[in-house]
Amino acid sequence: MWWRRSRTNSLRYTVHPFASLQRSMIAPMDWTTIDACRTSTELPRPVEIRGWIRTRRDSKGGFSFLEVNDGTSLGNLQVVAPAELENYAEEIQKLTAGCSVVVQGELVESPAKGQSTELHASSVRVIGWCDGETYPLQKKRHSFEKLREWSHLRARTNTLGAVMRVRNRISQSIHRFFDDEGFNYLHTPIITASDCEGAGEMFRVTTLNLEKLAGSNRPFDTKQDFFQKPTHLTVSGQLEAETYATALSRVYTFGPTFRAENSNTSRHLAEFWMVEPEAAFYDLNDNMQLAERFLKRVFSDCLSHCGEDMDFFNERIEKGKIDQLKSVIEKPFEHMTYTDAVERLLACDEKFEYPVNWGTDLQAEHERYLTSVVGGPVILTDYPSSIKPFYMRVSDDGKTVAAMDVLVPGVGEIIGGSQREERLDVLQRRMAEGGLDESEYWWYVDLRRYGTVPHAGFGLGLERAVQYVTGMANIRDVIPFPRTPGNAEF
C-alpha cells in the first residue's frame, strides 16, 4: 500500500508509483506446466506447453506421439501431432530425445491407459535441436556412476529429476518449519578463521601464489595473505549462530559447508549443505524434542507434496520406503544413553566389523543395528566427553557431555547436536584440554562473560536427509554437482 497526505492533511490511499512497473515486470506465465496438464480436470481447453522431447513414436495412421517433459513432474505428457501440421515431415518426424519444443493445442481427456490427459497439437515449434547420435541420455539405462560423468544432463533422467524435486521440497520444508517455530534465518560466513569441530580437516583459503612461494624457498607468511591470518572454508556455522542465538533467542543457518576429509565413501562429500538451529534457553530435552518435530515435519511434507516421486522411489529404489517414513512420522522416538547402547551392542550376537568399546565412536553398522532392534528412530545421548567437541556441555559425572545423535533405520546418524557449554570456566578448561588457542576464540568465550544462558542446537546434513527420504544408495547422487576427493568437475 502507498499512503500520502492530501491538501487537507488527511491520509489517503493511492496507487504505489511503481505498481504499474511491477505488474509489467511480473507478468503471469502464458504457458501451462506438464504437471498442471496431467492433473487438470478442466477439459477440454487450449494450452501451450514448453519442454523437452523424451520419445517420439510415429503411427501409420498419419500422426506422431510425442512424450514431452518439463521437469515439473515425473510423468510425461503425451502430445498427438497430426500429419496435417505444416512442419510435420520436415521437423516433427525428425524430433529425437532432448529436443526442446513449444506445443500449442487442445488438452483433452485421454482414452489411453495410464494417463488422464493428452494434448492434441495444433502447432509444434522446435526451439532447440538435439543430435540423437551424440546425446548421452539414450533409451538404454545408464548406471548412476556413469550418469555422474554427465552431471550437467543427469537431472533430465527420471531418477535424478525426482531426487532434485524431493531435495527442493526438503529445503522448502526446512525453512517453513523453522519459520513456524519462531526461528530467524541467519547467514553465517563461509570463510572463517575458526575450526568448530577442532579436527583440522579444513580447506585453506589463500590468494598467495603457492607455486611462486615454493620456488623461492621462503616460508609461508600469512601476514602477506589477503586476511593476514590463516583462513579456511567453514565446516559449520554453529559457533557464529550461537552469537546470534544469544541475542535473537532462536536462529538457524542453512548453507554450504566443507570438510577436507579424504573419504571416498557413499556417505561423504567434501562440499554439502547443513541446517543448524541454535536456541537460547534450550536444554538437551528441548533440543531432542525440536529435532523430532523437525524430522517428522520434513518427512511428512515429502509424502504430502511429492507423492508421484515418492511412489517411484518406493517401487524402483527402495521397497517399503513410504511405510518406513510413515512409521518414523507416527512413532515416538526411542531414547537411549550411549552407555546403554554400548551394553546392548556388547550383549548381542551380531558380528560387527568394528569392535565396540565404551569411549569410542559408534560406527554406522552399530547405529543401524540399534534402530533395527528398536524398530524405529533412536536418540542417543550422554556421550563420553573424550570423543566429542569442546563446546558440548559437560555432565555432572565429569565423564560425559550433553550430546545427542538421532539415528534413523537403514542409515544411522542423521542429526548430531548438543546442549552447549555455557559455563566460562568449564569451557576454558575444555579448550585447553583440546589444545585450542583461546585467543582465536575470544569472541566465542565472550558469550559466557556477558549474560551467558543455557542454549542448544543441532546439525542436519541436507544430503543425508535426501538420501534417507529417497533411498538413494550413494550421497553423490543427491546433490547436483558432487565434490569428492579427486573430483571437482562442472
Curated annotation (Swiss-Prot):
Residue ranges that the Swiss-Prot or TrEMBL entry lists as coiled coil: none
Presence of keyword Nucleotide-binding: yes
GO cellular component: cytoplasm
Gene coding for it: asnS
Protein biosynthesis found in the keyword field: yes
Alphabetical list of CDD domains matching this protein: AsxRS_core, EcAsnRS_like_N
InterPro entries: Aa-tRNA-synt_II, aa-tRNA-synth_II, aa-tRNA-synth_II/BPL/LPL, Asn-tRNA-ligase, Asp/Asn-tRNA-synth_IIb, NA-bd_OB-fold, NA-bd_OB_tRNA
Catalyzed reactions per annotation: tRNA(Asn) + L-asparagine + ATP = L-asparaginyl-tRNA(Asn) + AMP + diphosphate + H(+)
Species in which this protein is naturally found: Rhodopirellula baltica (strain DSM 10527 / NCIMB 13988 / SH1)
Family: Belongs to the class-II aminoacyl-tRNA synthetase family.
Record-listed E.C. numbers: 6.1.1.22
Self-association and partners: Homodimer.
Record localization: Cytoplasm
Any GO BP annotation: asparaginyl-tRNA aminoacylation
Keywords: Aminoacyl-tRNA synthetase, ATP-binding, Cytoplasm, Ligase, Nucleotide-binding, Protein biosynthesis
Protein name as catalogued: Asparagine--tRNA ligase
Pfam families documented for this protein: tRNA-synt_2, tRNA_anti-codon
Any one GO molecular function term: asparagine-tRNA ligase activity
